[in-house]
Structure formats: structure tokens, C-alpha cells
Amino acid sequence: MSIAETNTTTEVAAPKKKMCCACPETKKVRDECIVANGEEKCAALIELHKVCLRKEGFDV
């Protein structure tokens, strides 16, 4: 492997946490909304949680 290949592979950061442990604040609010109101009424909270997960390095 050349130096150029090594640098390319190290640029991709792996998530530091498991998905189940990432973004506990948005996960809790999202889950409570889904239980109380149903998934279709919580789309905004679901999307906020996905944004948080993406910031943590997950591909969702």
C-alpha cells in the first residue's frame, strides 16, 4: 500500500460509539413522541435524531 492510499483510508472516521448509545437526548424525545403520538406525527423529531447520528459518523 502506498502512502497516498494510506492517507485516503484514514480520512474516513469511524463512529466512536455504538448507534444505540449515540445521541441519547434526541433518542429519548423521539421515542417518547412515537409512543405517545405514533411515528407519522413525530417526523421532525425523527429527522433531528438522524441529523445527530450523522454528526456522530453514522450513515443513516
Curated annotation (Swiss-Prot):
A motif (Cx9C motif 1) lies at residues 23-33. GO terms for cellular component: mitochondrial intermembrane space. Keywords: Chaperone, Copper, Disulfide bond, Metal-binding, Mitochondrion. One of its GO terms (biological process) is mitochondrial cytochrome c oxidase assembly. Disulfide bonds join 23-52, 33-42. The keyword Nuclease does not apply. One of its GO terms (molecular function) is copper chaperone activity. Its main location: mitochondrion. A motif (Cx9C motif 2) lies at residues 42-52. The keyword Metal-binding applies. InterPro entries: Cys_alpha_HP_mot_SF, Cyt_c_oxidase_Cu-chaperone. It comes from the Eukaryota. Cu cation binds at residues 20-21. Residues 20-60 form the CHCH domain. It is found in: Mitochondrion intermembrane space. Copper chaperone for cytochrome c oxidase (COX). Binds two copper ions and deliver them to the Cu(A) site of COX. Belongs to the COX17 family. This is Cytochrome c oxidase copper chaperone.
